[in-house]
Amino acid sequence: MRNLTELSLRHRSVVWYFIIVFAVGGIIAYASLGRMEDPSFIIRQMVITAAWPGATAEDMQEQVTDKLERRFQDTPGLKEITSETRAGQTIIYVDLRDDVDENLIRPTWRDVRNFGEDVKRELPDGVIGPFYNDRFDDVYGSIYAVTGEDYTDEELRAAAENVRRRILSVPSVQKVELVGVQRERIYVEIARDRLASLGIPPTAITEALRTQDTVLPGGSIETVNGTVNLRVSGVFDSLDDIRALPIAADGRVFRLGDIADISRRPIDPADPKMQYNGAPAVGIAVSMEDGGNILALGEDLKKLTAQLREDLPLGMELHEVSNQPAVVQHSIHDFVETLAIAIVIVLAVSFLSLGLRTGLVVACCIPLVLAGTFVCMYALGIDLHKVSLGALIIALGLLVDDAIIAVEMMSVQLERGKTRFDAACHAFTQTAKPMLTGTLITCAGFIPVAFSKGMASEFCAALFPVIGIALLLSWIVSVMVAPLFGYHLIRIAGNAEHDPYATPFYRFFRRVLTFFLAHRAVVLVSTALVFFVSLAAFPHIKQTFFPPSLRPELLVSLTLQQGSSLASTQAEADRLTAILDENSDKIENYVAYIGQSTPRFVLTVNPKADAENRAQFVITAKGTEEREALAAIIRDAADDELTGARVATQYIQTGPPADYPVMLRVSAPTTDEVRRVAEQVSAIAAADPATDNVHLDWTEKAKGIRVDLDKDKLKRYGLSAKDVKQMLYTEISGAKAAEFYTGDRTLGIVLRLTEADRTDLGQLGALPIPTRSGSIPLDQIARLSYEAEDGLIKRHNLLPSIMVEADVTQGEGNDAALRIYDATEELRENLPAGTTIVPSGALADADDSMNYLVKPVPAMIFIIMTLLMFQVGSMGKMALTLLTAPLGLIGVVIAMLLTDSAMGFVAYLGVLALFGMIIRNSVILIDQIQKHEAAGERPRDAIIDSAILRLRPIMLTAAAAILGMLPLMFNIFWGPMAVAIA
């Protein structure tokens, strides 16, 4: 290898030129890098929905869900298919494997659409859809709420729509959605008795409305002066027009307003709602286009919303619900502050251990390496976020190693009397090759996360390129720039040659080494014993795949029984609202989503499908302590004040999302069997002392009334089952009869009975059914009976499936999930054929990610072994070097247990990085031993002299790495990795 240090010193002007270029380029690149809180990762999921009004959940499953699911099984790269089927509605989730290439995802979704269209012709008449959503991973980082105490829902919607249109013009905005909009209808409600006494069939009213509102061309007349279009009046312009509509029956003509109440009001049952601090609101959710600058977008939105607030009517307010740009700015600021602290710590180590001038050389190298890293990050499109900044901090503890080793060797040679030029060039010949090998080995330690699949690896994908770039640049700087700085800065007092290793400390260290070598059998056995004790203690380390974040948001989900109305859910949400108002001193703001879940305002939040029996609160606390206090208050209230719903509290995750810490999926061929086994698993989970809020995600039946029609009587009255079904649907739920056009909106005109008539179950049998000879009560042609039916059926890969879910004591995480799963072993061994119990959620994600992470490990080992062979040239020495790496587990286990840290995904990455660092130091030491042996020393003397020679640089680099990790130890995400490395 050509002496790059000599080249640098002979062409100093060129080197100084590139130093300036990279320094300036680094500043510009840092200012231009995109900012994010978390790195993006692809959610490989498509959501398919379909509706069949009037169908039971069982009919929906058999006639719609099953047919679609079976066809979707042909999807290439399929991981799993899950579905939620309710009465009249199905939602199917198609998930792809994590190893499906990003470029194949869109073509795969096209295949799914084609599969669905193939099945469409086999679906029953009346099925609406299927519809496809392959943008399930859109993140709405900025959410606003429009409120106004004295304004109607329609006025709030109109104001929010105006805000939406204004925001769409902002650069980098991709999509703006309204949330919690209450649609309006024109309701034509007629009393049951009036309908029966007049003998007017609802179909007559429907037909009259439909024929009146039809928009048809009136024709046009060509004249010498141009074309004149004919516009024929007749469509409804106002409610009075509808009231004046003539209805003919039995030779008589009535005005519709005389026999029915006609009103314009919000849809009933209501649409999913949004509330801000307990007040009705319409939300505005904003997503950013790919590649946009979120901080620039935040500034643009801040300016625009300030102007929009001034334009709103008096008494109407625009509130900021979620401000991702501000969160990102705060997160980046905290990480940059941590990086600055780490730099100060590393510099302090350098100055204290090497002296002012030598330490200054190292200090000058650090910003140069960081600047070069920023330039490369900008070129590769790597943004500043939690992972890339964490990688920089990790790299910081490593990148100073090469500079310290180079300048330390240069200082030693200067102390031995060499000139500055010769000392610098000698440092290259002695250390450059082993340093490069060690650097490449350290980079190779991150190969598993770089080339493995899975959301976790995708989340941490920036680790390998950022650390690799930083370490390679640090080697280049250490052999070309550090010697140049050292040439100008390092001075040795006096001109007399002296041995820097003839101090009392080194003499003591020599005696210790001599003793260890003389008693090497005892040392080796003791080391092996400690190593195996560490392995035995390893299972006692806590297991948590990804920890919760320190964001102030608290997510609270309320789930009522299947079949519960939106009004019941609203009542339960109002109780929680009252509790939050009592603790307003701990809250910045809170938002309630009734009948729906929050939009995905953070990538790690997993939205749920709309359901009338579900509500979700997003509570922004004033700090993490207040967040913890609120969670405790709400959990206590779940047993006393919120007994009508299942209450679940959750913090935002720092990695891929999971709904609950404990999730076990039970699948079986029948719904009865899956319920039976799920109840047993639930009992096992409840017996674990660490669990709380153990429940099944569906099991209870929904209430229903069965209407058994008498076919003979139907025939006698000239009716069909279809006639009766349509009539009941019209009278009870309301059928759309026509449309009303107002401004840019189209409102449906719905015909139904009055509220008193359609909600009284006791009078259901008296509902009038029109016949050719007049109306008859329903119970004259049918028998009514109460029954319980499946309100919800969930399936996983075509089988009925129930999820056993539970919260756990803080800090338990995957430990509790694994413990509960192991406790089901006896039950699993005795399950009937086709019935399974498998882990899901975080535990399954951890297993999948670790399996993916392990796959590239053989390649990593091969690369490390190859590098070692090129360096040491001996199988024995290569094996010796590799054997030093596992000894790092001794310190890892001790540190993790003492700090009570959890062994999760990032901690395993830290262990791999630690192995690379240990091997790196071993390479440099063995290379030094080989040089001493080549100079004629006996192996024993070569070992001792090399260890003495390498002690200071190894100790300094270790101290820099350990102390550089200190700021990260207090970070909830990177803390376990920092503990493992340090």
Residue ranges: model-predicted function:
Residues 321, 328, 332, 407, ...:
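Helix-loop junctions and hydrophobic alpha-helical segments within the transmembrane domains
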Residues 13, 21-55, 117-126, 378, ...:
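Transmembrane helices with small-residue packing motifs
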Residues 26-32, 317, 344-411, 864-950, ...:
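Hydrophobic transmembrane alpha-helices and their membrane-interface caps
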Residues 1-35, 431, 497-546, 587:
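Signature of alpha-helical transmembrane segments and their immediate interfacial
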Residues 396-410, 431-451, 458-497, 617, ...:
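Transmembrane alpha-helices and their membrane-interface boundaries in multi-pass membrane transporters
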Residues 7, 16, 49, 166-344, ...:
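Extracytoplasmic/periplasmic membrane-proximal domains and adjacent transmembrane bundles
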Residues 5, 23, 59-135, 193-214, ...:
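Solvent-exposed, membrane-proximal periplasmic/extracellular interface segments of envelope transport
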Residues 35-46, 83-89, 126-149, 177-183, ...:
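Flexible hinge/switch segments at interdomain interfaces of large molecular machines
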